[in-house]
From Swiss-Prot:
Bias kind Pro residues: ranges: 226-236
Zinc finger boundaries on the chain: TFIIS-type: 155-195
Binding site for Zn(2+): 159, 162, 187, 190
Subcellular location: Virion; Host cytoplasm
Gene3D superfamilies registered for this protein in UniProt: 2.20.25.10
Taxonomy, superkingdom: Viruses
Organism encoding this protein: Variola virus (isolate Human/India/Ind3/1967) (VARV)
Record InterPro entries: RNA_pol_30_chordopoxvir-type (IPR009162), RNA_pol_30_chordopoxvir-type_N (IPR024394), Znf_TFIIS (IPR001222)
Catalysed reactions, as listed in the record: RNA(n) + a ribonucleoside 5'-triphosphate = RNA(n+1) + diphosphate
A molecular function GO annotation: zinc ion binding
Name recorded for this polypeptide: DNA-directed RNA polymerase 30 kDa polypeptide
Length: 259
Protein backbone atom coordinates (compact mmCIF):
# COMPACT_ATOMS: atom_id res chain seq x y z
CA UNK A 1 0.00 0.00 0.00
CA UNK A 2 1.40 3.36 -1.00
CA UNK A 3 2.00 5.81 1.81
CA UNK A 4 0.03 9.05 1.52
CA UNK A 5 1.30 12.19 3.16
CA UNK A 6 -0.13 15.70 3.35
CA UNK A 7 2.86 17.08 1.48
CA UNK A 8 2.06 14.91 -1.54
CA UNK A 9 -1.32 16.67 -1.95
CA UNK A 10 -0.12 20.22 -1.29
CA UNK A 11 1.48 22.00 -4.23
CA UNK A 12 1.66 25.52 -2.82
CA UNK A 13 2.17 25.09 0.92
CA UNK A 14 4.90 22.98 2.51
CA UNK A 15 3.78 21.24 5.66
CA UNK A 16 5.77 20.75 8.81
CA UNK A 17 8.00 17.72 9.29
CA UNK A 18 5.91 16.33 12.15
CA UNK A 19 2.70 16.17 10.16
CA UNK A 20 4.40 15.20 6.93
CA UNK A 21 5.91 12.14 8.61
CA UNK A 22 2.49 10.98 9.80
CA UNK A 23 0.83 8.39 7.68
CA UNK A 24 -2.53 9.99 7.00
CA UNK A 25 -3.88 6.95 5.23
CA UNK A 26 -3.31 4.68 8.22
CA UNK A 27 -4.90 7.23 10.51
CA UNK A 28 -8.00 7.63 8.37
CA UNK A 29 -8.36 3.89 7.84
CA UNK A 30 -9.28 3.63 11.52
CA UNK A 31 -12.46 5.61 10.88
CA UNK A 32 -13.46 5.09 7.23
CA UNK A 33 -13.09 2.31 4.69
CA UNK A 34 -10.82 2.38 1.64
CA UNK A 35 -13.73 3.11 -0.73
CA UNK A 36 -14.22 6.61 0.73
CA UNK A 37 -10.61 7.31 1.60
CA UNK A 38 -9.34 8.75 -1.68
CA UNK A 39 -12.36 10.97 -2.25
CA UNK A 40 -12.18 12.28 1.31
CA UNK A 41 -8.50 13.22 1.07
CA UNK A 42 -8.92 14.86 -2.32
CA UNK A 43 -11.96 16.83 -1.14
CA UNK A 44 -10.23 17.95 2.08
CA UNK A 45 -7.16 19.17 0.21
CA UNK A 46 -9.23 21.10 -2.32
CA UNK A 47 -11.45 22.81 0.22
CA UNK A 48 -8.71 23.55 2.74
CA UNK A 49 -6.61 25.35 0.14
CA UNK A 50 -9.61 27.18 -1.34
CA UNK A 51 -11.32 28.29 1.87
CA UNK A 52 -8.25 28.69 4.03
CA UNK A 53 -8.69 31.32 6.72
CA UNK A 54 -5.48 33.02 7.69
CA UNK A 55 -4.72 32.69 11.38
CA UNK A 56 -3.82 35.94 13.08
CA UNK A 57 -0.88 36.10 15.42
CA UNK A 58 -2.77 37.22 18.49
CA UNK A 59 -0.90 38.93 21.30
CA UNK A 60 -1.92 40.61 24.53
CA UNK A 61 -2.13 43.95 22.76
CA UNK A 62 -4.90 42.92 20.37
CA UNK A 63 -6.78 40.27 22.35
CA UNK A 64 -9.73 40.92 24.59
CA UNK A 65 -11.42 38.18 26.56
CA UNK A 66 -15.17 37.71 26.42
CA UNK A 67 -17.31 39.30 29.11
CA UNK A 68 -19.74 36.40 29.46
CA UNK A 69 -20.37 34.51 32.66
CA UNK A 70 -18.09 31.60 33.45
CA UNK A 71 -20.81 29.04 32.76
CA UNK A 72 -21.50 30.57 29.33
CA UNK A 73 -17.92 31.41 28.41
CA UNK A 74 -16.96 28.87 25.77
CA UNK A 75 -13.54 30.41 25.28
CA UNK A 76 -14.08 32.61 22.25
CA UNK A 77 -11.59 35.38 21.74
CA UNK A 78 -11.33 37.84 18.90
CA UNK A 79 -8.61 39.93 17.37
CA UNK A 80 -8.81 43.71 17.26
CA UNK A 81 -6.45 43.88 14.33
CA UNK A 82 -7.25 46.77 11.97
CA UNK A 83 -7.05 44.50 8.93
CA UNK A 84 -9.06 41.64 10.41
CA UNK A 85 -11.70 43.09 12.69
CA UNK A 86 -13.59 40.72 14.95
CA UNK A 87 -11.87 37.57 13.71
CA UNK A 88 -13.27 35.00 16.07
CA UNK A 89 -11.43 31.78 16.85
CA UNK A 90 -11.87 29.03 19.41
CA UNK A 91 -9.28 28.38 22.07
CA UNK A 92 -7.74 24.88 22.01
CA UNK A 93 -8.65 24.05 25.62
CA UNK A 94 -12.26 23.23 24.64
CA UNK A 95 -13.00 19.58 25.34
CA UNK A 96 -12.82 17.44 22.21
CA UNK A 97 -14.37 14.15 21.25
CA UNK A 98 -12.44 11.24 22.73
CA UNK A 99 -13.34 9.05 19.76
CA UNK A 100 -11.23 11.25 17.47
CA UNK A 101 -8.64 12.21 20.09
CA UNK A 102 -5.64 11.41 17.88
CA UNK A 103 -6.89 13.56 15.04
CA UNK A 104 -7.93 16.34 17.42
CA UNK A 105 -4.48 16.40 18.99
CA UNK A 106 -2.96 16.76 15.54
CA UNK A 107 -5.26 19.69 14.82
CA UNK A 108 -4.17 21.42 18.04
CA UNK A 109 -0.49 20.94 17.25
CA UNK A 110 -0.59 22.27 13.69
CA UNK A 111 -1.34 25.57 12.01
CA UNK A 112 -1.93 27.01 8.58
CA UNK A 113 -3.24 24.99 5.67
CA UNK A 114 -2.34 21.66 7.27
CA UNK A 115 -4.57 22.48 10.23
CA UNK A 116 -7.43 23.34 7.89
CA UNK A 117 -6.81 20.09 6.00
CA UNK A 118 -7.11 18.04 9.19
CA UNK A 119 -10.24 19.91 10.20
CA UNK A 120 -11.90 19.09 6.90
CA UNK A 121 -10.87 15.47 7.33
CA UNK A 122 -12.48 15.37 10.77
CA UNK A 123 -15.66 16.89 9.40
CA UNK A 124 -15.77 14.41 6.53
CA UNK A 125 -15.21 11.45 8.86
CA UNK A 126 -18.10 12.51 11.09
CA UNK A 127 -20.39 12.89 8.07
CA UNK A 128 -19.45 9.44 6.75
CA UNK A 129 -20.13 7.94 10.17
CA UNK A 130 -23.62 9.45 10.16
CA UNK A 131 -24.28 8.54 6.54
CA UNK A 132 -24.47 12.18 5.42
CA UNK A 133 -22.92 13.67 2.28
CA UNK A 134 -19.94 15.82 3.31
CA UNK A 135 -19.30 17.42 -0.08
CA UNK A 136 -21.69 20.32 -0.48
CA UNK A 137 -21.11 20.35 -4.23
CA UNK A 138 -22.85 16.98 -4.52
CA UNK A 139 -25.90 18.00 -2.51
CA UNK A 140 -28.85 18.80 -4.76
CA UNK A 141 -30.90 21.78 -3.72
CA UNK A 142 -34.64 21.35 -3.44
CA UNK A 143 -36.54 22.99 -6.31
CA UNK A 144 -39.76 24.73 -5.32
CA UNK A 145 -40.69 25.86 -8.82
CA UNK A 146 -43.67 23.51 -8.86
CA UNK A 147 -45.10 25.27 -5.81
CA UNK A 148 -44.03 28.90 -6.14
CA UNK A 149 -43.97 30.78 -9.45
CA UNK A 150 -43.48 34.24 -8.03
CA UNK A 151 -40.51 35.10 -10.23
CA UNK A 152 -41.69 33.19 -13.28
CA UNK A 153 -42.03 35.44 -16.32
CA UNK A 154 -45.24 33.67 -17.25
CA UNK A 155 -46.99 34.95 -14.12
CA UNK A 156 -45.16 38.25 -13.61
CA UNK A 157 -46.89 41.59 -13.92
CA UNK A 158 -46.13 43.13 -17.35
CA UNK A 159 -44.26 46.40 -17.44
CA UNK A 160 -46.47 49.26 -18.72
CA UNK A 161 -43.49 50.89 -20.43
CA UNK A 162 -41.90 48.06 -22.46
CA UNK A 163 -44.57 45.33 -21.97
CA UNK A 164 -41.92 42.94 -20.68
CA UNK A 165 -42.68 40.36 -18.02
CA UNK A 166 -39.13 40.32 -16.69
CA UNK A 167 -40.26 42.16 -13.56
CA UNK A 168 -39.68 41.70 -9.84
CA UNK A 169 -41.93 42.84 -6.98
CA UNK A 170 -40.19 44.72 -4.18
CA UNK A 171 -41.42 45.79 -0.77
CA UNK A 172 -40.24 49.38 -0.40
CA UNK A 173 -41.68 50.24 2.99
CA UNK A 174 -43.38 48.29 5.74
CA UNK A 175 -46.06 49.96 7.80
CA UNK A 176 -48.33 49.11 10.68
CA UNK A 177 -50.11 45.78 10.88
CA UNK A 178 -53.43 47.28 9.76
CA UNK A 179 -51.93 49.06 6.74
CA UNK A 180 -50.73 47.49 3.50
CA UNK A 181 -47.01 47.77 2.71
CA UNK A 182 -45.66 49.95 -0.04
CA UNK A 183 -44.96 47.62 -2.98
CA UNK A 184 -43.36 48.55 -6.29
CA UNK A 185 -42.43 46.46 -9.32
CA UNK A 186 -39.08 46.86 -11.08
CA UNK A 187 -38.50 45.99 -14.72
CA UNK A 188 -35.12 44.44 -15.44
CA UNK A 189 -35.23 45.32 -19.13
CA UNK A 190 -36.07 49.02 -19.17
CA UNK A 191 -35.00 49.70 -15.55
CA UNK A 192 -38.30 51.40 -14.74
CA UNK A 193 -40.40 51.18 -11.57
CA UNK A 194 -44.18 51.05 -11.59
CA UNK A 195 -47.03 50.57 -9.17
CA UNK A 196 -48.75 47.19 -8.89
CA UNK A 197 -52.11 46.85 -10.64
CA UNK A 198 -55.31 47.43 -8.70
CA UNK A 199 -58.64 45.69 -8.91
CA UNK A 200 -61.35 47.63 -10.72
CA UNK A 201 -64.67 48.26 -8.98
CA UNK A 202 -67.57 46.88 -11.03
CA UNK A 203 -71.21 46.02 -10.42
CA UNK A 204 -72.44 42.50 -10.57
CA UNK A 205 -75.78 42.77 -12.36
CA UNK A 206 -76.94 39.38 -11.18
CA UNK A 207 -76.36 40.24 -7.54
CA UNK A 208 -77.99 43.66 -7.93
CA UNK A 209 -81.07 42.24 -9.63
CA UNK A 210 -81.38 39.54 -7.01
CA UNK A 211 -81.08 42.02 -4.16
CA UNK A 212 -83.68 44.33 -5.75
CA UNK A 213 -86.04 41.41 -6.26
CA UNK A 214 -85.49 40.34 -2.68
CA UNK A 215 -86.25 43.84 -1.44
CA UNK A 216 -89.49 43.86 -3.42
CA UNK A 217 -90.55 40.63 -1.81
CA UNK A 218 -89.77 41.98 1.63
CA UNK A 219 -91.79 45.11 0.87
CA UNK A 220 -94.76 43.06 -0.20
CA UNK A 221 -94.57 40.92 2.93
CA UNK A 222 -93.88 43.76 5.35
CA UNK A 223 -95.41 46.93 3.89
CA UNK A 224 -94.29 50.29 5.14
CA UNK A 225 -97.38 51.71 6.95
CA UNK A 226 -95.52 54.31 8.96
CA UNK A 227 -96.64 57.91 8.49
CA UNK A 228 -94.64 60.10 6.18
CA UNK A 229 -92.27 62.56 7.82
CA UNK A 230 -93.58 66.14 8.09
CA UNK A 231 -92.59 68.66 5.51
CA UNK A 232 -89.68 70.82 6.40
CA UNK A 233 -90.75 74.34 7.41
CA UNK A 234 -89.53 77.33 5.47
CA UNK A 235 -86.43 78.89 6.95
CA UNK A 236 -87.00 82.04 8.93
CA UNK A 237 -85.99 85.37 7.44
CA UNK A 238 -82.73 86.68 8.89
CA UNK A 239 -84.25 90.17 8.99
CA UNK A 240 -87.19 89.00 11.08
CA UNK A 241 -84.90 87.27 13.52
CA UNK A 242 -82.75 90.34 13.87
CA UNK A 243 -79.71 88.69 12.40
CA UNK A 244 -79.26 91.44 9.79
CA UNK A 245 -79.38 95.07 10.88
CA UNK A 246 -80.41 97.93 8.62
CA UNK A 247 -77.47 100.24 8.05
CA UNK A 248 -77.51 103.85 6.87
CA UNK A 249 -74.99 106.42 5.82
CA UNK A 250 -74.03 109.30 8.11
CA UNK A 251 -75.25 111.86 5.56
CA UNK A 252 -78.68 110.29 5.45
CA UNK A 253 -81.39 111.31 7.78
CA UNK A 254 -81.87 108.99 10.70
CA UNK A 255 -84.87 106.71 10.47
CA UNK A 256 -88.03 107.81 12.14
CA UNK A 257 -88.95 106.15 15.36
CA UNK A 258 -92.05 104.07 15.30
CA UNK A 259 -94.76 105.58 17.48
Amino acid sequence: MENVYISSYSSNEQTSMAVAATNIRELLSQYVDDANLEDLIEWAMEKSSKYYIKNIGNTKSNIEETKFESKNNIGIEYSKDSRNKLSYRNKPFIATNLEYKTLCDMIKGTSGTEKEFLRYLLFGIKCIKKGVEYNIDKIKDVSYNDYFNVLNEKYNTPCPNCKSRNTTPMMIQTRAADEPPLVRHACRDCKQHFKPPKFRAFRNLNVTTQSIHKNKEITEILPDNNPSPPESPEPASPIDDGLIRVTFDRNDEPPEDDE
